[in-house]
Amino acid sequence: MPELPEVETVRRMLETHLVGRTVRSVRLSGLKLREPVPRALPRQIRGRTLTGVRRHGKYLLIDLSGSLTIVSHLGMSGRWLFYVEPPERALPHVHARLEFEDGSELWFQDPRRFGVLRAVPTLRLPADHSLARLGPDPLATPPTGAGLAELARGARVSAKSFLLDQRRIAGVGNIYASEILFRARVDPRRAAGRLAVPEWGAVAAELTRVLNEAIARMGTTFSMYRTLWNEPGTYAEKLRVYDRADQPCRRCRTPIRRIVQAQRSTYFCPSCQPSRPARGLARRPMTRSRADRG
């Protein structure tokens, strides 16, 4: 599933290339995504001009003239593709085609059909059923150790599950949760409510750092994710633990372990991420190794 860095990459490209373009027509596949695409969508957005593109967590918010916003979620396999000159042969699994007045087109493709696409009056976005339950966006509101510790107070869920809970932090998914906890030297199985403030401080710092590093490389591509120009992200080559089961840790050479938590794969280093913090760890700040800086 595209996570915050992938969605932010798409957002920046959409903002750069589409703002100012006016929608001439819209064609829908008629197939249901995670929820039905409203039949009224073409009528709602036809004739409107794109005025801005925002993001909250994994949701894209495409603002249109007349105070209307397209709410989009890429789901497991969704992607937005932009064509200055559309291909003659249509691609499979394209569920929406927006044609602009200059002849360029924006396509929403989603093979697995877990995405979301609808239009909402901009003033009603805070009450939207998808957006209203999301926690803060970590790039818009960078977390702090004290803030995360307070949010996790009494939580029995694992540190990994805590990071994945979109009601607490919007945008972190399976790939980056494993990477963040490795960088912070926190065992993903530990109860979130038992982490000390300095440990949460390390998580907060690495969360911001990892997400920004991934954005700089246009995100991570393993199979389906592509940018607006159908290009893959290149952050996969920088991953420390994710999808590296049984390979040596880049920091200490211990084999990386893979476990399953809440039906999702988790990757970690048993040596760098001990199940119990070293004595005094909760009282001193963590340092970064050379592998972390690379």
Q: Could you tell me what each predicted segment is?
A:
Residues T22-A40, R54, G147-G294:
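Basic, nucleic-acid-binding surfaces and adjacent catalytic neighborhoods in DNA/RNA-processing proteins
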Residues M1-A119, L125, P142, R244, ...:
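Gly/Gly-Pro- and Ser/Thr-rich, intrinsically disordered tail segments characteristic of DNA damage-repair
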Residues I70-R183, A191, P198, A204:
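Phosphate/anion-contacting hairpin/loop surfaces
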